């Protein structure tokens, strides 16, 4: 089959690799029909090379049609249309029973001290082959796949793999009061969808912050009040307080996370890590840190006293101290974590209808063949061509 593989920093290629076989009796094989490029894929593309091997298959936002089932699979049959969550969860352990599928005790990567395995996401999370490929082996075939109806385009359902549950959980964790206010930092796919979900769930004011004109324009179209970071810079806090009676918003969603691109200090750290052998680089990334907390520091400034910060952006080890004194003084609540995809499916599926309240049918800015994946990664990295969300079609 053809698959997009990691080869080195800013070097991904579409190669011919062996088709995945059934390995366990509850496995299924899915023929991929659409697969997204996620912002966290850029962390692999640029920063997390020490945790990758050349040839690793990337991608964790796939959907498709069941091609083959193992002998103990009864939950799906050949020909079923399914979306595959990005976290690999068994559905039966204590953590899955608590709705914490991202902490699945069956697939936790204990030797790394991390949570549930993830498709296409490094040795930190199990080194499971990803979904930017023609076929994908999916374990736990009776529990993990999300069955969706045939008929509507893939655009209707593919974001159940990551974007929708991640954005939904971000809003859930933000705990915005009815008619309340929230600032969304970063209007990439997760931030843009979180802004839409917050408005759909009754927020009275959603402030979106970014510095990419296309992202700001798109969020404005869906009802967000947008602030261009290029204009406000260090005065962003004053601008937000001006819109909220001097208090700041009830909540802030940090949809930025690790500064994988753009920060000179972070860039220098990334370069230094890239010069080290993998074992030393891993240790540096896990202890000294390879990113900055600029977005989180901004969130602490923007949120009102007694408010909530919800972190959905991925961080890779902090190089800045946490502003604990300020957070304590302002009585800020902080919630974060990988999305528990399966937990939110019942909330999300009823919204994926023809009236399309969240705008999923037109959410992708680019649809490209899998063979164009390497160029798509670079375009996404440079924020060129208006690229916000790309679906690759194998």
Show where each model-derived region lies:
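Residues in the short beta-alpha loop(s) of Rossmann-like NAD(P)-binding domains
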Residues: 212, 315, 340
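Rossmann-fold dehydrogenase core element
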Residues: 305-312, 322-362
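Glycine-rich beta-strand-centered segment in the early N-terminal region that forms part
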Residues: 18-35, 48-97, 101-102, 129, ...
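Cysteine-cluster motifs in flexible loop/terminal segments that predominantly coordinate metals
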Residues: 38, 86-150, 154
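Residue-level recognition of short, solvent-exposed, well-ordered loop/turn junctions
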Residues: 23-24, 77, 177, 247, ...
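Mid-domain Rossmann-like dinucleotide-binding core that forms the NAD(H)/NADP(H) cofactor-binding site
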Residues: 81-82, 134-135, 145-234, 238, ...
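Glycine-rich cofactor phosphate-binding loops and adjacent beta1-alpha1 units
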Residues: 174, 217, 222-333
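C-terminal hydrophobic helical "lid"/dimerization subdomain
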Residues: 297, 301, 342-394
């Amino acid at each position: 089959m053809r698959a997009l593989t990691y080869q080195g920093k800013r070097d991904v290629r579409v190669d011919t690799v062996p088709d995945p076989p059934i390995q366990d009796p509850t496995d299924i094989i899915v023929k991929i029909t659409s697969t997204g490029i996620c912002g966290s894929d850029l962390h692999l593309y640029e920063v997390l090379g020490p945790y990758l091997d050349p040839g690793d298959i990337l991608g964790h936002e796939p959907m498709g049609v069941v091609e083959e089932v193992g002998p103990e699979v009864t939950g799906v049959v050949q020909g079923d249309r399914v979306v595959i969550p990005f976290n690999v969860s068994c559905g039966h352990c204590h953590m899955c029973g608590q709705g914490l599928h991202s902490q699945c005790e069956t697939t936790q990567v204990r030797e790394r001290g991390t949570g549930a395995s993830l498709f296409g996401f490094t040795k930190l999370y199990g080194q499971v082959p990803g979904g930017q490929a023609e076929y994908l082996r999916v374990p736990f075939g009776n529990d993990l796949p999300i069955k969706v109806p045939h008929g509507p385009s893939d655009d209707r359902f593919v974001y159940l793999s990551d974007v929708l549950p991640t954005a939904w959980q971000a809003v859930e964790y933000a705990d915005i009061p009815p008619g309340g206010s929230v600032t969304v930092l970063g209007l990439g796919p997760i931030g843009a969808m979180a802004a839409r979900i917050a408005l759909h769930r009754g927020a009275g004011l959603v402030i979106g912050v970014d510095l990419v004109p296309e992202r700001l324009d798109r969020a404005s179209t869906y009802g967000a009040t947008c602030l261009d970071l290029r204009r406000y810079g260090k005065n962003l806090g004053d601008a937000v307080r001006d819109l909220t009676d001097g208090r700041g918003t009830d909540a802030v969603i940090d949809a930025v996370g690790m500064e994988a691109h753009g920060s000179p200090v972070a860039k220098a750290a990334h370069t230094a890590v890239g010069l080290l052998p993998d074992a030393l680089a891993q240790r540096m990334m896990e202890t000294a840190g390879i990113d900055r907390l600029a977005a989180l520091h901004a969130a602490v400034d923007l949120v009102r006293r007694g408010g909530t910060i919800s972190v959905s952006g991925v961080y890779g080890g902090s190089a800045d101290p946490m502003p604990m004194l300020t957070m304590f003084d302002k009585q800020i609540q902080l919630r974060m974590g990988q999305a528990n995809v399966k937990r939110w499916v019942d909330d999300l599926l009823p919204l994926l209808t023809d009236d399309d309240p969240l705008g999923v049918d037109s959410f992708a800015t680019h649809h490209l063949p899998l063979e164009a994946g390497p160029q798509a990664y670079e375009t996404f990295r440079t924020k060129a061509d208006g690229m916000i969300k790309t679906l690759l079609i194998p």
